[in-house]
């Protein structure tokens, strides 16, 4: 590596604190009672329960979500036998990947022991601590013996990722590659370069899926592995030794091969060898950092080749992070006693199937303009595909249950998948009541920026989840082109409707209706006609007004207030309401917080604040949450009589009269709103109990500042909204930073609102 990269890597590992992992408590330790519960004397209670029933350890300790990454440093990736201590940064890195991709906690354990039996004894003795063991960077052939003996001795999963992780991903790639070139696994011939742990595991898995052993030829550093080549050949190699036909080199056996599997070293495969391979050959050149052959060189001589490498700068990266976090997730969640062949094969099929699915928006944004539709350049998913956990973990868990190694079977797989989805989409639990209602009676929702990539991704999700009947406004040719480019599987006229914003036969009716609404607001017929042609928000609003759609989402492009001005002009306020307001939800580790008014009213009056607070409470109830409202101010329960504080006090009295059942108090400081003890010091008899979840600000400035500070300062927080309240129709104006998931969430909310709209 160059000097700049080397120094950057060293700085990354040293600052702000050395290393990449830490231990964080999951329980509060703020009081003497907390300490008494966490340690002596309270800790005796779970100890005694575990003594009576060892499975209780999964209930009272972190064991069920804790994996050991264990190595002796004899085969550290790309570095060789550098020793246990020198390999520690790699093991920490593995732990970070477990946590990042599957939420699994890891202790990295570096064992300074080269004797396999002694190493086995050390690892086996650690069984009470962990829910699973990930063996890492242990050289062959010792790794086979170590894994086998540990699997025999231990009643928790033991998984050597260097073997099985590579095998699972490679096998998934081969299955999909064969599908692309229309070849049968039982007929193809494969040549393998390398006979280490990964190569042997790959071959074993492929044979389990139907590849014929007699169609596999293996070459190691001494050439072709044939029977009786040498005395005392390792059993793992001997299992794939072929009859001696006089061929000794890779060049001798590559002629006519359908697949080349490289688990060896750089530049092993030449262009001349590639030329001799069969029609549409598959080349898996997995040596790192330099593969057996670089993809451009292979493509020069065989444009029909499908190529995989271990590198991220070429298509079809075979990366173990595609499987090991999710295999362990599934295994841990059912208390598996092993990771068996059935579980590995389940992972293979889940990974292979995901490559056929529509493109994920997260992956699309991470990989730019790459075409990620299933085909020669995309036969395995990308490592950052958020759907990996919800596809692989359940498949592995079910395989564990079906094969009899699960000690804690999952009773409700739908609920389990929902729980895994929360890891991908932090809003999933929050939105669950809304999604459930939306699915019962999906409504027609017009999305006014239908050509936007985020809107198209959202449309795919809406159809997949069954939440709405989307109507997209945009040019049909552009929408179709972008659907193809994004690798989506939705079809116009089948999954969604398109309204062509350049020419629709209804436009004369639309602009005529828009003119009737706007004619006494300074808009001429000509201006109304231009507005319909130029402004998709106007088109969408008129569609909802005419009953051609039930709800509308706009604002992913452009200024919020320009969109809102159209919404306000076309729809006006709902019955009994004289103002509109906007509210944003922040889903923080400390709880859900709603802030209003973030977008509509610059300086609301007491009457407007009262309406906004009552509407906010109504909206929060839709999420199954009891509203607790605090009116915020620099004044704390009458400490100031300035106009702003007086306004909040006046709003409180209006709210009490209009919604006496509402739990609300004010005016108060922000800390008093969120911390009951602080509030009680100043106002012991406050009707507001616990932490407020709706914060009504004195003006838009305070609301927007507070919202953005909380949004940015909480790295774990996610947002929903803005939710538009008080408009006569179910309409929400989003902002240009809206993610795909936020669009989906707001469409679902609009559907639920439309379900309760009077006809």
Describe the residue ranges of each PLM region.
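Anion-binding alpha/beta catalytic cores of soluble intermediary-metabolism enzymes, centered on
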Residues: 85, 137-184, 407-410, 417-759
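A short, aliphatic-rich alpha-helical micro-motif
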Residues: 127, 185, 253-254, 274-277, ...
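NAD(P)-binding Rossmann-fold cofactor-contacting core
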Residues: 193, 209-237
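Adenosine-phosphate binding glycine-rich loop
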Residues: 2, 161-162, 178-184, 285-393, ...
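Glycine-rich adenosine-cofactor-binding loop
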Residues: 66-78, 83, 167-171, 181-207
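Rossmann-like adenosine-cofactor binding region
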Residues: 235-305, 311-313
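N-terminal ligand-binding/catalytic initiation module
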Residues: 1-158, 399, 406, 432-456, ...
């Amino acid at each position: 590596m160059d000097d700049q990269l080397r120094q950057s890597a060293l700085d990354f590992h040293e600052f702000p604190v050395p290393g990449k992992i830490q231990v964080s408590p999951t329980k509060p330790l703020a009081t003497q009672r907390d300490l008494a519960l966490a340690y002596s004397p309270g800790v005796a209670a779970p100890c005694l329960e575990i003594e009576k029933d060892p499975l209780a350890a999964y209930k009272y300790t972190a064991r069920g979500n804790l994996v050991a990454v264990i190595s002796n440093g004899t085969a550290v990736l790309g570095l060789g036998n550098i020793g246990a201590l020198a390999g520690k940064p790699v093991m920490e890195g593995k732990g970070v990947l477990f946590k990042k991709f599957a939420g699994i906690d890891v202790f990295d354990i570096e064992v300074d022991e080269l004797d396999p039996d002694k190493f086995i004894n050390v690892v086996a003795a650690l069984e009470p601590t962990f829910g699973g063991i990930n063996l890492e960077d242990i050289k062959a052939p010792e790794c086979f013996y170590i894994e086998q003996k540990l699997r025999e001795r231990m009643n928790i999963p033991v998984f050597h990722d260097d073997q099985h992780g590579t095998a699972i991903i490679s096998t998934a790639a081969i299955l999909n590659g064969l599908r692309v070139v229309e070849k049968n696994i039982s007929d193809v011939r494969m040549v393998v370069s390398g006979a280490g742990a990964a190569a042997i595991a790959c071959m074993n898995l492929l044979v389990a899926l139907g590849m014929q052993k007699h169609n596999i030829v293996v070459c190691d550093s001494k050439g072709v592995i044939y029977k009786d080549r040498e005395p005392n050949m390792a059993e793992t190699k001997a299992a794939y030794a072929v009859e001696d036909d006089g061929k000794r080199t890779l060049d001798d056996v590559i002629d006519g091969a359908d697949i080349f599997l490289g688990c060896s070293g750089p530049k092993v495969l030449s262009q001349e060898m590639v030329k001799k391979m069969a029609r549409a050959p598959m080349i898996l050149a997995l040596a790192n950092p330099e593969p057996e052959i670089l993809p451009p060189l292979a493509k020069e001589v065989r444009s029909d080749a499908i190529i995989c490498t271990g590198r991220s700068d070429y298509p079809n990266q075979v990366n173990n992070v595609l499987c090991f976090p999710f295999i362990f997730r599934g295994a841990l969640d059912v208390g598996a006693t092993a990771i068996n062949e059935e579980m590995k094969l389940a992972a293979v099929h889940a990974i292979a199937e995901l490559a056929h699915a529509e493109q994920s928006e997260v992956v699309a944004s991470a990989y730019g303009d790459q075409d990620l539709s299933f085909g020669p350049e995309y036969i395995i998913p990308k490592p950052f595909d958020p759907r990996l956990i919800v596809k692989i973990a359940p498949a592995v868990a079910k395989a564990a249950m079906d094969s009899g190694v699960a000690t804690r079977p999952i009773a409700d797989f739908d609920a389990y998948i929902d729980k895994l989805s929360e890891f991908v989409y932090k809003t999933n639990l929050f939105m669950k009541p809304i999604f459930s209602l939306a699915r019962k009676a999906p409504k027609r929702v017009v999305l006014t920026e239908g050509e936007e990539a985020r809107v198209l991704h959202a449309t795919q999700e809406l159809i997949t989840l069954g939440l709405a009947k989307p109507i997209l406004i945009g040019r049909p040719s552009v929408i179709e082109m972008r659907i193809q480019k994004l690798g989506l599987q939705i079809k116009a006229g089948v999954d969604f409707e398109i309204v062509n914003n350049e020419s629709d036969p209804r436009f004369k009716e639309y602009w005529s209706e828009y003119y009737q609404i706007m004619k006494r607001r300074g808009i001429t017929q000509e201006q109304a006609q231009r507005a319909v042609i130029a402004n998709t928000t106007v088109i969408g609003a008129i569609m909802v007004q005419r009953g051609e759609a039930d709800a509308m989402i706009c604002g992913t492009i452009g200024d919020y207030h320009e969109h809102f001005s159209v919404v306000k002009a076309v729809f006006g306020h709902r019955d009994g309401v004289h103002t509109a307001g906007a509210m944003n939800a922040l889903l923080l580790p400390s709880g859900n917080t709603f802030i209003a008014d973030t977008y509509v009213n610059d300086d609301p009056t007491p009457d407007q604040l009262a309406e906004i607070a009552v509407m906010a409470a109504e909206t929060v109830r839709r999420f199954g949450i009891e509203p607790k409202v605090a009116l915020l101010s620099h004044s704390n329960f009458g400490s100031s009589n300035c106009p702003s504080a007086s306004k909040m006090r006046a709003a409180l009295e209006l709210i009490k009269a209009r919604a006496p059942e509402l739990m609300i108090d004010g005016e108060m400081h922000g800390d008093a709103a969120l911390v009951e003890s602080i509030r009680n010091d100043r106002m012991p008899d406050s009707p507001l109990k616990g932490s407020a979840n709706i914060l009504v600000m004195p003006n838009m400035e305070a609301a927007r500042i507070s919202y953005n500070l909380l949004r940015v300062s909480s790295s774990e927080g996610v947002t929903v909204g803005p939710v538009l309240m008080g408009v006569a129709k179910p309409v929400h104006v989003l902002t240009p930073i809206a993610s795909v998931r936020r669009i989906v969430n707001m469409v679902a909310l609009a559907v639920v609102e439309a379900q309760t709209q009077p006809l």
